[in-house]
């Protein structure tokens, strides 16, 4: 497939902020994509080379890309850097420079999607002393044969600066429309994606075999399953109103959610966001096979840091010391853990997703041979509100965050929320001491001591029905100087020249970001807002909801994706459950 076809579609997609138009352009591209290339196309438009859990990254710095453009164009690197500073986009700058190129390559090799993709994969695999020079030569070889427009999008793919605003849901809409005749079939594709976590594989299947091929997807060891998520409740009475008596209450631990895959003594571990984190937990890899009565299994657990002397649980942040490339053995010794299992998704050839929580829990307890390192999360059956209050108090006294509440008869719904699981934490019982996990979508430049940094951040919830990020507040308090420096470093690579199509905001930020970074925020209350877009029209026509006096807690939710952020439905529920409903005119912006 000619790369120019992909580049043309990318150019069209970059020029629109309308989701329906984006989906239509993508659908047209997928229809004309040969089956053998469609997985590559799906990965590339998402800015990836392979699914997230394989951890393949290009590792190309801007300076290296500038050297490659210089080599291909014959122009000094300083001139290219000046054009880059002017345009703010190396792809655009390179396109302009290559249009002025006087030399002609008579024996140019054809630029196809396959060639570009294979070259990028070779670049990603390069390591060692000469790897940077080899990467530069590979990039230059593509640019030598590329048209200016092709070169622009090759560089955007290499540097990860392709800003299309296309999420998995948009890709699945386009795939369903292109190969099954209707977007209404997206749930079938979504189920396949939820058990495989590989949208490229789903695209290959539906493009060649339609819905029948997609229905053949099944749970497989070492292919992570997208985790089931919980809604929140603020009180014991609300939980019982939603679930009824007889619900199961598990302790909610403050650790890292880990999906454990076991086969024949081999263990791999995946995070909540599907990152392969096996290297950070060699103690789990070594010890868990001896604690599980299974040949093959996929289980979910919470890895929690502990004080070995007292046995007490330590905060989640302690686990971050394990996130290092070197001296991991020292970190394991210094920051010991326990592995606390709470669900089983697959066991010795049996897919457990469709069976009830009660059945899964019984299987789990039969599989885990408990000791001080590996155990099952404590659970109890709740007959009434008094018992739920006692269970919450017991969990907090045990050093936990609160409770996870689960319907006994409910299946495991991979990749979704839906009321089958609820979380009840101690702070949710306050007037609005509740914390919310919000996505950073924009920023306003600081003044005074904050000059040269982002002084205030624009935050959003996640609207899962529209797959958008509607704004909910600006936050400028709770930050230390160290926080501001860290956020500037974290957010600067995510700056976009125009607002991401998935962002819904009535404000104009000084800087827009791709919605990727999640932070924890507290506030005094939730108010109606004429400015912010969260839950727009849900409470009052023309009004959204906003946080009043929001404050950063100091906690970045690095384990969460943007789609894991607090939803507009959660905010509506919190607003309605306030003891007094705050009137209009208190926007809390």
From Swiss-Prot:
Superkingdom:
Archaea
Similarity comment text for this entry: Belongs to the ATP-dependent DNA ligase family.
HAMAP family tied to this protein: DNA_ligase (MF_00407)
InterPro entries, per this entry? ATP-dep_DNA_ligase (IPR050191), DNA_ligae_ATP-dep_bac/arc (IPR022865), DNA_ligase_ATP-dep (IPR000977), DNA_ligase_ATP-dep_C (IPR012309), DNA_ligase_ATP-dep_cent (IPR012310), DNA_ligase_ATP-dep_CS (IPR016059), DNA_ligase_ATP-dep_N (IPR012308), DNA_ligase_N_sf (IPR036599)
Q: Which GO terms describe its biological process?
A: cell division; DNA biosynthetic process; DNA recombination; DNA repair; lagging strand elongation
The protein's name: DNA ligase
Q: Which cofactor does it need?
A: Mg(2+)
Alphabetically sorted, this entry's keywords are: ATP-binding, Cell cycle, Cell division, DNA damage, DNA recombination, DNA repair, DNA replication, Ligase, Magnesium, Metal-binding, Nucleotide-binding
């Amino acid at each position: 497939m000619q790369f120019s076809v992909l580049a043309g579609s990318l150019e069209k997609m970059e020029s629109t902020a309308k989701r329906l138009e984006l989906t239509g352009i993508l659908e047209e591209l997928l229809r004309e994509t040969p089956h053998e290339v469609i997985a590559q196309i799906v990965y590339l438009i998402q800015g990836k080379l392979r699914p997230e859990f394989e951890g393949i990254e290009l590792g190309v710095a801007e300076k290296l890309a500038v050297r490659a453009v210089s080599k291909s164009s014959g122009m000094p690197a300083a001139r290219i850097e000046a054009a880059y500073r002017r345009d703010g986009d190396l792809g655009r700058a390179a396109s302009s420079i290559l249009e002025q190129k006087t030399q002609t390559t008579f024996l140019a090799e054809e630029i196809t999607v396959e060639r570009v993709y294979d070259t990028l994969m070779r670049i990603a695999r390069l390591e060692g002393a000469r790897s940077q020079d080899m990467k530069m030569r590979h990039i230059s070889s593509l640019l030598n044969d590329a048209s200016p427009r092709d070169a622009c999008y090759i560089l955007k793919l290499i540097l990860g600066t392709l800003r299309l605003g296309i999420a998995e849901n948009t890709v699945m809409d386009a795939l369903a429309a292109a190969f099954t005749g209707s977007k209404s079939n997206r749930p079938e594709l979504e189920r396949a994606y939820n058990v495989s976590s590989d949208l490229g594989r789903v695209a290959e299947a539906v493009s060649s075999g339609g819905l029948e091929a997609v229905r053949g997807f099944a749970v497989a060891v070492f292919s992570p399953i997208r985790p089931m998520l919980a809604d929140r409740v603020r009180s014991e009475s609300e939980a019982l109103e939603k679930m009824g008596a007889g619900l199961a209450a598990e302790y909610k631990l403050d650790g890292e959610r880990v999906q454990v895959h076991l086969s024949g003594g081999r263990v791999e571990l995946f995070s909540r966001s599907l990152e392969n984190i096996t290297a950070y937990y060699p103690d789990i890899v070594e010890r868990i096979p001896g604690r599980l009565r299974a040949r093959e299994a996929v289980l979910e657990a919470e890895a929690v840091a502990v004080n070995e002397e007292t046995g007490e649980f330590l905060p989640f942040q302690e686990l971050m010391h394990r996130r290092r490339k070197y001296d991991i053995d020292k970190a394991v010794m210094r920051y010991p853990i326990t592995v606390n299992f709470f669900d089983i998704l697959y066991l010795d050839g049996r897919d457990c997703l469709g069976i009830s929580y009660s059945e899964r829990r019984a299987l789990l307890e039969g599989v885990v041979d408990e000791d001080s390192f590996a155990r099952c999360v404590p659970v109890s059956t709740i007959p009434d509100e008094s018992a739920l209050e006692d269970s919450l108090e017991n969990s907090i006294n045990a050093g936990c965050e609160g409770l996870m509440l689960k319907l006994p008869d409910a299946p495991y719904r991979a990749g979704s929320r839906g009321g089958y699981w609820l979380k009840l934490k101690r702070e949710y019982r306050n007037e609005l001491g509740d914390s919310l996990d919000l996505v950073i979508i924009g920023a306003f430049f600081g003044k005074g001591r904050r000059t040269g940094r982002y002084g205030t951040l624009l935050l959003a919830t996640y609207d899962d029905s529209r797959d958008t990020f509607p704004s909910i507040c600006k936050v400028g308090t709770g930050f230390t100087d160290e926080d501001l420096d860290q956020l500037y470093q974290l957010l600067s690579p995510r700056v976009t020249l125009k607002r991401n199509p998935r962002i819904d905001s009535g404000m104009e930020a000084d800087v827009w970001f791709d919605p990727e970074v999640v932070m924890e925020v507290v506030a005094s209350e939730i108010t109606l807002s004429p400015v912010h877009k969260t839950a727009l029209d849900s409470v009052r026509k023309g009004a959204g909801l906003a946080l009043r006096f929001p404050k950063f807690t100091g906690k970045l939710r690095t384990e969460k994706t943007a789609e894991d952020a607090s939803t507009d439905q959660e905010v509506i529920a919190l607003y309605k459950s306030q003891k007094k409903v705050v009137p209009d005119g208190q926007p809390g912006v």
